[in-house]
Amino acid sequence: MAASASSWRFPRAFWTANAAELCERAAYYGTFIALRTYLLRVVGLDDVQAGFVAGLFGALIYLFPFFTGAISDRLGFRHSLILAFGLLAAGYGALGRFHTMGPVSLSLLLVVLGGAFVKPVISGTASKSSNEANRARAFSIFYMIVNI
């Protein structure tokens, strides 16, 4: 059974949202891989503290979207992504500049908040950019991007 050409057509916002998700995930996983080592060697935490901070960072970035989703709906796609990537840029930029736990904690919080604004926008855009005929394909593309 061949897929119709229209089932592959999505608005530009759909593809932009998926590209944004791909960039956010690449930045998150790239940071998460090195975070514990950074906390140990640069910030000076011990193993337990570094593990706790890294685990908390990972947990919060998945918990906060439950709260930021409503705000993202009110702000809209464009403003939410601008806010999200502004927070992410500030957070990731600050991580490279500071070497004590206070500023590093604030930097990680900015990253968490930025990531929390990206997630609901992307899934909402996948839903709004699709119809009954191509919704499964839209979410398949979205989940493929998330899992790359």
Name each region found by the language model.
Residues 136-148:
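Glycine-rich segments within core transmembrane alpha-helices of 12-TM secondary carriers
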Residues 117-131:
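Intracellular juxtamembrane helix-capping segments at the cytosolic ends
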Residues 33-49:
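Short amphipathic helix-loop junctions that connect adjacent transmembrane helices
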Residues 86-100:
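C-terminal ends and interior cores of transmembrane alpha-helices
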Residues 55-70:
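Central cavity-lining transmembrane alpha-helices of secondary-active solute carriers
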Residues 22, 91, 102-118:
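Hydrophobic core of transmembrane alpha-helices in multi-pass small-molecule transporters
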Residues 44, 76, 97-102:
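Helix-breaking motifs and short loop linkers at transmembrane-helix boundaries and internal kinks
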